[in-house]
Amino acid sequence: MAKLPASNSLEVLVEKAILTCSLNGVLTNPKQHPVPVTPEQVAASARDAFNAGASIMHIHFRMQEEDLGHLPSWEPQVAADLEAAIRDACPGVIINQTTGVVGPDVSGPIACMRRIKPEIAACNAGTLNYLKLKKDGSWAWPPMVFDNPVEKVAEMLAVMKETHARPEFECFDVGIVRSVGLYQDNGMCTKAQYNFVMGVASGMPADTELLPLLLKYMKPGAFWQTTLIGQKEIWPVHQKTAELGGMLRTGVEDTFYLPSGERTTGNGQLIETLAQYARNAGRAVASPAEARQML
C-alpha cells in the first residue's frame, strides 16, 4: 500500500483506491470513437464515470467548432465551460488538467490553469521520442519529440504552485521516474506524485514485471498510479497496480477495450470495471471526500 503518515483515519483511507477517469484525450476523433467533446457530452460522460466510482476527472480541452472536435484547444473560456459542466454533473469531483504541449510555448496550459484552478495538474516530467508504427512498418505519424526540458517543467511547476494545483508527474520511462526525485531534492516541488505511463510504443510497456522496479526508484511513501495505454493486455497491469497499493486510472483517452477484448461503450463502463479490479484486490473505492483527504 502507498505509505502515509500514521494516524487511525489515514490507515483506514489508505486501503481505499482513488479512481481517475481520463475523459477524452488530445486527438482521438469523436466521429470514430466514443470521446466526449462538448460541455454537454463531457458532463454526461463524467457523470457516468463518477457514478461508477471515479473521484478525479482528467480532462483535455477540445475545439468546440463543428468538425474540429478532434483538435486541442487552449482557450481559457473553453476550459472554464468544460470544468463547470463537470463540476455541476459531479458534486465534489476533483479536476486533473492536462498541460502537455510540444515546444517551448506553455502559455496555453498556463492560461487554462489560471482560469480554472484545478486541484491537480499533469506535469510531463521528461522528454520522449513519441513514435508509433503501422502494421506495414511505416510511421503512424511523423516521428516527434515530446520535449519536456527542465526549464519547461520548472515553468509549469511555478504556475501549479501559484494556482495551488498538485503536480502529478507523468513518467514515460525509469529515467523520468528518477528525474522526479531530483526535482524534489532540488526544491522544484515539495511532494512527488507519480503517474507511470505504460503502453506508449516508444516508452515503457504495459508489463506487470516493471512495477516493482518503478516503485523501487520513486520517492518513498509517494502517491502513485498507472496510466495504461492499449487493449485487453493492460488489464492485468491494472490488477497488479491495485494489489500493490497504487491508485487507478482508465478512460477512453487510454483504451477503448474491456478485459474481454470487447469495445467499451464509454467511460462509465471502463470505470465500473476498474472499480471491480480494486475490490478484487480487497480495496474499497474512495469517495471524492476521502480522495481529497488522502491527497
Residue spans for each PLM region:
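Conserved, mostly hydrophobic/aromatic
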Residues: V42, A49, H60, A121, ...
